[in-house]
Structure formats: C-alpha cells, structure tokens
C-alpha cells in the first residue's frame, strides 16, 4: 500500500513524521542508526524497512489482543500509517531482566538477573537531559498527566509486556526490556504510540542480541542488519534489509 507524502512535522534520530490530515499521520523509518544519544550515527541501508515491519507485526498483534494502538497499516516498505494523538512526554521502560542503565544505578544486581516481577520505570522524554528517570509524583506535580492515567499507563504497559513476552517466548526469544510511549486520542482515551522494533527493545536468542544493543556495544551496521533480519526470519516476516 502506498502512503502519501503529507507535510513533514517532525524529524528525530530514527523517524520522520508526516501530517496527512487532522486525524492521521505517516511515520517513516530512516535507514540510519544512532547510539550514545546520537554521538554515533551511521547509514544503515534496509534498517528502516526492517524496523517498520517489526513495528507493524507487534502493533497488529497488540491491536488483535485488545490493546489500543495508533497503528493502522504498513506500506510494505519504510512507512506506517498511524492515528494522530496528543503525546504524553513520558517514556515507559518495562524491564524483565537487569540490564543497561538499571545495572549502572543498581550494581548490586548481576546483569541479566530475572526480576521476580517486571519493573515499570517512567522517564521524562527529553533528549537534552538524556531522558532522566522520574517518579510518578514528578509526573503529577509537573501536570504531565493525571494519577488515574499514570496507573492506566502502568497497567497497559504490564499487559503489553505479558503479551510480547509470551509471543516471543513461543519463538525461543527472551524479551529483556523495552520502551513504550503513549498518547491520548480525540476522545480522551489512552493509546499506545511510537514503535516496537529492535530499536526500542532488547531481544535475545540463545544469549545473542537481535536488537540495537549490538550497535551500542560497538558492532557494525552489517551485524545490526543481520540481527534485525534474523529476528524477522524467526518471526516469519520474510523480510531482509
């Protein structure tokens, strides 16, 4: 399906967003990869299509499983058609295993220790401040959203974690952690937004990363594309970069 160009309204490290009309947007995934808050940036041919296909796969699955998402359809290439939302400037990280920034702030726990229950973290979405960890009370005091909506975000995030962990587990994959973003639609309902791909989740197959962690650890673009392609192959998406 071909998706129209629209008006460019946002460009970030990994995506461009185009306005189609008051209710709909197109998200275009770039053939670029960044790490270390953009300090390392390289051209990655085929990555956009791989990330878009993964997002389409996971978002479609969540839609079918009763989670309201912004996803409408995928053009078969680097673009997805989504619903326009009023975004909440908070990133949610759900952790099943100790890894990454969690280890840096809590070194008493060994890497890849499985948590007794999943952890849900809230981070202020702010590149200049490096998306700092914040409290629920911070969110309320800053007026970013209501306590009721924060609790709904937490509940939906845990549901998404359960669904994705179960799905990936069927393929022999381990979901270490992942990032979510949410928005509110014109009716005031909470909606899962942004993307779900190797860019925003850590997924292991027999202890090996099939996600952007490879690049963060100094791996090459070629290794990254091979990992994303491997994830697609395992999920039966039939795509290569």
UniProtKB/Swiss-Prot annotation:
Its EC number is 6.3.2.6. CDD domains: SAICAR_synt_PurC (cd01415). It catalyses: 5-amino-1-(5-phospho-D-ribosyl)imidazole-4-carboxylate + L-aspartate + ATP = (2S)-2-[5-amino-1-(5-phospho-beta-D-ribosyl)imidazole-4-carboxamido]succinate + ADP + phosphate + 2 H(+). Keywords: ATP-binding, Ligase, Nucleotide-binding, Purine biosynthesis. One of its GO terms (molecular function) is ATP binding. It is an enzyme of class 6 (ligase). GO terms for biological process: 'de novo' IMP biosynthetic process; cobalamin biosynthetic process. InterPro entries: SAICAR_synt/ADE2_N (IPR028923), SAICAR_synt_PurC (IPR033934), SAICAR_synthetase (IPR050089), SAICAR_synthetase_CS (IPR018236). The keyword ATP-binding applies. The keyword DNA repair does not apply. HAMAP family: SAICAR_synth. This is Phosphoribosylaminoimidazole-succinocarboxamide synthase. The gene is purC.
């Amino acid at each position: 399906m071909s998706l129209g160009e629209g008006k460019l309204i946002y460009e970030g490290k990994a995506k461009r967003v185009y306005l189609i009309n008051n209710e709909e947007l197109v998200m275009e995934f770039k053939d670029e990869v960044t790490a270390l808050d953009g300090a390392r940036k390289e051209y990655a041919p085929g990555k956009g299509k791989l990330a878009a296909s993964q997002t389409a796969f996971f978002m479609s699955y969540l839609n079918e499983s009763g989670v309201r998402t912004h996803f409408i359809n995928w053009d078969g290439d680097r673009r997805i058609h989504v619903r326009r939302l009023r975004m909440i400037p908070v990133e949610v990280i759900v952790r099943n295993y100790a890894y990454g920034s969690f280890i840096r702030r809590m070194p008493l726990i060994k890497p890849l220790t499985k948590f007794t229950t999943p952890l849900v973290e809230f981070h202020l979405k702010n590149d200049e401040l490096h998306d700092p960890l914040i409290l629920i009370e911070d969110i309320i005091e800053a007026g970013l959203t209501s306590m009721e909506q924060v609790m709904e975000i937490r509940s939906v995030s845990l549901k998404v974690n359960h669904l994705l962990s179960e799905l990936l587990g069927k393929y022999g994959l381990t979901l270490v952690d992942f990032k979510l973003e949410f928005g509110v639609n014109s009716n005031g309902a909470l909606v899962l937004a942004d993307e779900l791909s190797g860019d925003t989740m850590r997924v292991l197959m027999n202890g090996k990363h099939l996600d952007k962690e490879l690049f963060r650890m100094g791996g090459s673009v070629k290794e990254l594309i091979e990992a994303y392609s491997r994830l697609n192959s395992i999920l039966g998406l039939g795509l290569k970069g």
